[in-house]
């Protein structure tokens, strides 16, 4: 009797483990890969602080790689026991400092930001820490947003305004898929290019057409693409 109960218990545990693995690996439909324009983060009323590693380049930076459902909802914090382990991705840190900096105040080295992204989104991705961060870095290189915009004559310059559809078409031409453009408002009340959303398949292997676009962050027909190249010797923008 005890043996049969023991076997049954083992079977239940195995099934539960398999179910957990299944949910972890399949319980979302696609990723949003989100990049932000640093000038548009910094010139709002809340301002920003440059990382301890120095002012970032004038280029789009990674915000995150976020698992999502086709109904617009998303999973988050899928493993509350997880914690960021710097040793797991130590070979990526210098590249992440350049391409995935934190502009939040107070100034930081990025670890707090990366930890937030990993715990909230990465733990739902079915990727380990190294693969999660490496994948996001790879998609930034593939998307090449700034170059695609420059190729269309869309360059960061204060006071110039561009059509949102022109921005979308320039990115679509380079990436092959239509992005979602999120805007915010600068300290003078001007709408500006803030974040670009592209969609990635659930295996994190390629860009795809977005099953659904986010809500919020709507833009006018023309928006500013502010410069981030002005010299500034202060830590706070």
UniProtKB/Swiss-Prot annotation:
Disulphide bonds in the chain? 42-48, 78-124, 183-219, 199-210
InterPro entries in the cross-refs = Ribonuclease_T2_eukaryotic (IPR033697), RNase_T2-like (IPR001568), RNase_T2-like_sf (IPR036430), RNase_T2_His_AS_1 (IPR018188), RNase_T2_His_AS_2 (IPR033130)
UniProt propeptide residues: 1-24
Keyword Hydrolase on this protein?
Answer: yes
Q: Which GO terms describe its biological process?
A: RNA catabolic process
UniProt subcellular location: Cytoplasm
Q: Which amino acids does the record list as binding RNA?
A: 36, 63, 113, 116-117, 120-121
Record's Gene Ontology CC terms? cytoplasm; extracellular region
- UniProt keyword terms in alphabetical order: Cytoplasm, Disulfide bond, Endonuclease, Hydrolase, Lyase, Nuclease, Stress response, Zymogen
Q: Where is the active site?
A: 63 (proton donor), 117, 121 (proton acceptor)
Reactions it catalyzes: a ribonucleotidyl-ribonucleotide-RNA + H2O = a 3'-end 3'-phospho-ribonucleotide-RNA + a 5'-end dephospho-ribonucleoside-RNA + H(+)
Sequence similarity: Belongs to the RNase T2 family.
Name of this chain's protein: Intracellular ribonuclease LX
| Protein source organism | Solanum lycopersicum
The gene behind this protein is RNALX
């Amino acid at each position: 009797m005890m043996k049969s109960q023991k076997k049954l218990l083992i079977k239940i545990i195995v099934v539960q483990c398999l179910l957990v693995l299944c949910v972890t690996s399949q319980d979302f439909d696609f990723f949003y890969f989100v990049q932000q324009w640093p000038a548009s983060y910094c010139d709002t009323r809340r301002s920003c602080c440059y990382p301890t590693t120095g002012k970032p380049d004038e280029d789009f930076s990674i915000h995150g790689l976020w698992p999502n459902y086709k109904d617009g909802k998303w999973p988050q914090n899928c493993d509350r026991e997880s914690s960021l382990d710097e040793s797991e991705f130590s070979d990526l840190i210098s590249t992440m400092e350049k391409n995935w900096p934190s502009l939040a105040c107070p100034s930081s080295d990025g670890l707090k930001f990366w930890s937030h992204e990993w715990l909230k989104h990465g733990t739902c991705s079915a990727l380990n820490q190294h693969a999660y961060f490496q994948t996001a870095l790879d998609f930034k290189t593939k998307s090449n947003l700034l170059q695609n915009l420059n190729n269309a004559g869309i360059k960061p310059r204060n006071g110039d305004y561009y059509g949102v559809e022109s921005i979308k078409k320039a990115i679509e031409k380079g990436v092959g898929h239509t992005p979602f453009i999120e805007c915010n408002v600068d300290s003078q009340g001007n709408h500006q290019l803030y974040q670009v959303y592209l969609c990635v398949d659930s295996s994190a292997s390629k860009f795809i057409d977005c099953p659904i676009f986010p809500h919020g962050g709507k833009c006018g027909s023309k928006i500013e693409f502010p410069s981030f190249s002005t010299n500034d010797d202060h830590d706070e923008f």
